[in-house]
Amino acid sequence: MSGRISWEGWAVPPGHEAVRAIAAETPDSELIRWVDEALREKSGYTLPPKIHIVQQDGDYYNVMPCIYERGNIAMVKMIGRHSIKRGEDRSSMMGDILLYESDTGILRALMDGEYITTLRTGISAAHSARLFTRPDFETVGLIGLGNIMTVCIRAFIASLRAEGDRRDVTLKLIRYHDHQQRIMDLFREDPNVHFVLCDTYEEVIGGSDLVISAITKVTENFVTDEYFKEGCTVIPICTMGFQNCDLFFDRVFTDEMEQIRGFKYFDHFAPVTTNVTDVLNGAAPGRTDNVQRILVYNYGIAIHDLVFAANIYDRATVPDTPYRYSREKYFI
């Protein structure tokens, strides 16, 4: 993003409905632009690595701070995944975002972080898919057909069509609780999007030029090495299920090197790993031929939460909620 945010009102609380309504009015091309511009300007953000707090049974919290001095914005997001208990009516992912004036420390907004996370995660994956997939791709394999994947593949196809690219695209979908129907319904008006319904991961991944996974909990690799065709691009949105690819893929790209240093095979794939920002700014090459197998680890960076939250804040019309912080020095 460019320029300083216009802070008006006090703690504006755009909840889930408000955030969702604003996002629905924003074209996918603009959302992709937010991701792209933030990555290009990454050096202008203060971005500590996210704090990952592990709990029992695979539950966790991520704490993600970020400051953008040029925009006068500081942000922290607290988000976690927690198994749903009997009788609960909520998403397994819950999160909140706090926005502050960076030069005063005044809280300006409390926002729904779960929807923003879903949105920016899917859009980031779509951005990477456009950047690193071989230009002559035809077949896309999709695993984990929930909200993040819906955002991702919708934006990916929309960006192609917006550029006048009407090529035939085949989407290979894993059958799971009829989730595949939602993806198919997205493209009912596009005669050039075709579908193959699959019962196994081998069917989805084998022969696909682009493989995207959005499954949030995986305990083993989806398939063995031979199912990844030459020239394929693999984007594990939640970073799991493709550890075998770490050992033999030709190139690895990441949104933030520091956040993947703890991966089991990092030392093995580090020599072929490049930050996406360096590719966008011309400091390093991206895909250089149609035979490279490419792996993209977007571990999720707070600059995208900040940019999406700030842009949504600027568009919010919900009533202000007064926030009465201390205005004078006091003694206890």
List the model feature ranges, each with a label.
Residues 82, 106, 149, 218-219, ...:
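Glycine-rich nucleotide phosphate-binding loop and flanking beta-alpha elements
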Residues 1-118, 126, 303-306, 313-314, ...:
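N-terminal ligand-binding/catalytic initiation module
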Residues 192-267:
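Rossmann-like adenosine-cofactor binding region
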Residues 125, 136-159, 174-179:
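Glycine-rich adenosine-cofactor-binding loop
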Residues 132-139, 229-230:
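Short helix-loop-beta connector
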Residues 159-187:
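NAD(P)-binding Rossmann-fold cofactor-contacting core
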Residues 156-160, 226-227, 316:
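Active-site catalytic pocket residues across diverse enzymes, especially alpha/beta-hydrolases
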Residues 19-22, 245-332:
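Adenosine-phosphate binding glycine-rich loop
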